[in-house]
């Protein structure tokens, strides 16, 4: 994930294409509503449409958000239905069963694949051109399901993947060294879940490996402390859910960061989930650094991993593939 990349900017100048930017959010739960709020504050979209089976809740969210618009950006937010997917720049899918304390993301699969089939059936009635951005867990499996069930081009079906894990990882390493997290380049790849892995071999600060940075800055290189950063990253969602019941702020910021890269045609490298293959395992969706622009997500680099990282990525991809096969979508 590129260091120094931000969703928000003080630059209030908008392109002439701003009025055509419509983002549809399916799901008015914690993640969906927080994504709508974050998107409103970003000023990226002229229209934000909220769709939910609970229309009263979705309408209430839209009303509340519209009251924030005069204090932020000129954006129209409204309760919509699937017809509003027509001419949408992107459809963000956050709807689904939430992860409860003690549950893994994979535990949600059976319930959420059923929900997704209904949602995608409706979405594809009204758009064949939007970018589909999946946030519902297990996100890698549901990104693959979205691709298969819609027949959309692979570059236009994107999962939020490990963008939030990468952000968490950078935050924790930055905290360890007393640095702005955006000064840290360190990626989490593979599954957004228990088998994800840290790419230690390419982690860097100011162009230096972590070990070299510590030597140059006369800071102790503590491998155990760094491993704790990864452990905390991997367990972050469980820890937050145990305390407050759900995660939403970081995920929403990640989704809007992805949308920003698409809307601004940035060609930004972000760790998101997309169709890929690895080590002859076959087609599967998992996170790697991908280039994001107005056309979607594109894999432009091959990972040069250490032997240990390669083995871990193989196992991570296999675990996603197994889950895909369990719902008959291979």
From Swiss-Prot:
The active site is at residue 192. NAD(+) binds at residue 137. GO terms for molecular function: L-lactate dehydrogenase activity. Keywords: Cytoplasm, NAD, Oxidoreductase. It is an enzyme of class 1 (oxidoreductase). Pfam families: Ldh_1_C, Ldh_1_N. It catalyses: (S)-lactate + NAD(+) = pyruvate + NADH + H(+). Belongs to the LDH/MDH superfamily. LDH family. This is Probable L-lactate dehydrogenase. It comes from Schizosaccharomyces pombe (strain 972 / ATCC 24843).
């Amino acid at each position: 994930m590129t260091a120094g990349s931000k969703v928000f900017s003080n630059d209030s100048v908008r392109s002439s294409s701003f009025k055509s930017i419509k983002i549809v959010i399916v799901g008015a739960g914690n993640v969906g509503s927080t994504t709508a709020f974050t998107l409103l504050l970003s000023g990226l979209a002229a229209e934000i449409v909220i769709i939910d089976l609970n229309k009263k809740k979705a309408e209430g969210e839209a009303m509340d958000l519209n009251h924030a618009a005069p204090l932020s950006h000129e954006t129209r937010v409204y309760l919509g239905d699937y017809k509003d997917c027509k001419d949408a720049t992107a459809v963000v899918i956050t709807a689904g069963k939430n992860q409860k304390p003690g549950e893994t993301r994979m535990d949600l699969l059976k319930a959420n694949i059923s929900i997704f089939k209904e949602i995608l059936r409706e979405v594809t009635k009204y758009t064949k051109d939007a970018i589909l951005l999946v946030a519902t867990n297990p996100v890698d499996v549901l990104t693959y399901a979205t691709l298969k069930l819609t027949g959309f081009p692979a570059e236009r079906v994107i999962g939020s993947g490990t963008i939030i894990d990468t952000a968490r990882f950078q935050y924790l390493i930055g905290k360890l060294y007393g640095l702005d997290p955006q000064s840290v380049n360190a990626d989490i790849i593979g599954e957004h879940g228990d088998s994800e892995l840290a790419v230690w071999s390419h982690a860097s600060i100011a162009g230096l490996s972590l070990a070299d940075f510590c030597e140059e800055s006369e800071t102790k290189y503590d491998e155990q402390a760094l491993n704790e950063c990864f452990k905390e990253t991997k367990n972050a969602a469980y820890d937050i859910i145990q305390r407050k019941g759900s995660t939403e702020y970081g995920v929403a910021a990640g989704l809007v960061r992805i949308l920003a890269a698409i809307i601004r045609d940035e060609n930004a490298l972000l760790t998101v989930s997309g169709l890929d293959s690895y080590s002859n395992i076959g087609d599967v969706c998992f996170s790697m650094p991908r280039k994001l622009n107005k056309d979607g997500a594109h894999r432009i680099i091959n990972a040069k991993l250490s032997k240990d990282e390669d083995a871990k990525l193989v196992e991570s991809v296999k675990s996603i593939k197994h889950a895909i096969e369990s719902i008959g979508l291979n």
